[in-house]
Curated annotation (Swiss-Prot):
This is ATP synthase gamma chain. GO terms for molecular function: ATP binding; proton-transporting ATP synthase activity, rotational mechanism. GO terms for biological process: proton motive force-driven plasma membrane ATP synthesis. It is a peripheral membrane protein. The gene is atpG. HAMAP family: ATP_synth_gamma_bact. It comes from the Bacteria. Keywords: ATP synthesis, Cell inner membrane, Cell membrane, CF(1), Hydrogen ion transport, Ion transport, Membrane, Transport. Produces ATP from ADP in the presence of a proton gradient across the membrane. The gamma chain is believed to be important in regulating ATPase activity and the flow of protons through the CF(0) complex. It comes from Vibrio parahaemolyticus serotype O3:K6 (strain RIMD 2210633). Coiled coil: none annotated.
Length: 288
């Protein structure tokens, strides 16, 4: 029965693992709901900021902020959002592939690349790949705040202000639904113009700035970049919890199937052992 005993021990081990994955699935489901609430609460602000900035970029302004000016892209920056923890399927790999593909396109055009990374997974991946990382932040937890991101975003904005960057993008996973997380690249700088003809038609007027356009735009445009990065972080967090819940459910289901297979093997081994013992008993009785 040595073989059967080993199988029984393996069944016990898989059942213990199954309890862990089931618990992680339930925790991820709870965290996903909270993350979705935070994401949905911040989405209207981020989308409104994007619309306003799109209109500003299309307008004939008295003051042309540097963030509105197109320039030759010789140096390109990316703010890449990832998770701090694993066990979330291919979530990080998918967003890294998206970023690497876009980075390679710019490199082929002769552009230099510089990164700011959010999340320990992105830090490990891009540093291992030899990328130039200008700023990094990790350990944001399940409730990230805008203040946690200002430092890294500020580093990239300063580089843009000083002419060390000509383009700035944010890369993150966009939450579509529980089953779908979409790797996304959004241009932050120079400010993308609104491409909606309907919005351009409805809001073809210019803004009136009080008291002066320069201080107002200086503050507004920085706040816009910060809000878009923050939205990317909370979207990515909701994606992380959804992906982890799905991954842990798959692991739990696989454990159930494995236990059934092992129990079948165990029963066959036990039956074979009993049959062998009976054969030995019958053989011994016949000999007597």
């Amino acid at each position: 029965m040595a073989g059967a005993k080993e199988i029984r021990n393996k069944i016990g081990s898989v059942k213990s693992t199954q309890k862990i994955t089931k618990a992680m699935e339930m925790v991820a489901a709870s965290k996903m709901r909270r993350s979705q609430d935070a994401m949905e609460a911040s989405r209207p602000y981020a989308e409104t900021m994007r619309k306003v900035i799109g209109h500003v970029a299309n307008a004939n302004l008295e003051y042309r902020h540097p963030y509105l000016e197109e320039r030759e892209a010789k140096r390109v920056g990316y703010i890449i959002v990832s998770t701090d923890r694993g066990l979330c399927g291919g979530l990080n790999i998918n967003v890294f592939k998206k970023a690497v593909t876009d980075i390679q396109t710019w490199k082929e055009k002769g552009a230099e690349i510089e990164l700011a990374v959010i999340g320990s997974k992105a830090t490990a991946f891009f540093k291992h790949g030899g990328a130039k990382v200008a700023a990094q932040v990790s350990g944001l937890g399940d409730s990230p705040s805008l203040e946690d991101l200002i430092g890294s975003v500020g580093v990239m904005l300063k580089k843009y202000d000083e002419g060390e960057l000509d383009r700035l993008y944010v890369v993150f996973n966009k939450f579509v639904n529980t089953m779908v997380q979409q790797p996304t690249i959004d241009q932050l700088l120079p400010l993308p113009k609104s491409d909606s003809k309907e919005m351009q038609r409805e809001h073809s007027w210019d803004y009136i700035y009080e008291p002066e356009p320069k201080p107002l735009l200086d503050t507004l445009l920085v706040r816009y970049v910060e809000s878009q990065v923050y939205q990317g972080v909370v979207e990515n967090l909701a994606c992380e919890q959804a992906a982890r819940m799905i991954a842990m459910k798959a692991a739990t289901d696989n454990a159930t199937n494995l236990i059934e297979d092992l129990e079948l093997v165990y029963n066959k081994a036990r039956q074979a052992a009993i049959t062998q013992e009976l054969s030995e008993i019958v053989g011994g009785a016949s000999a007597v």
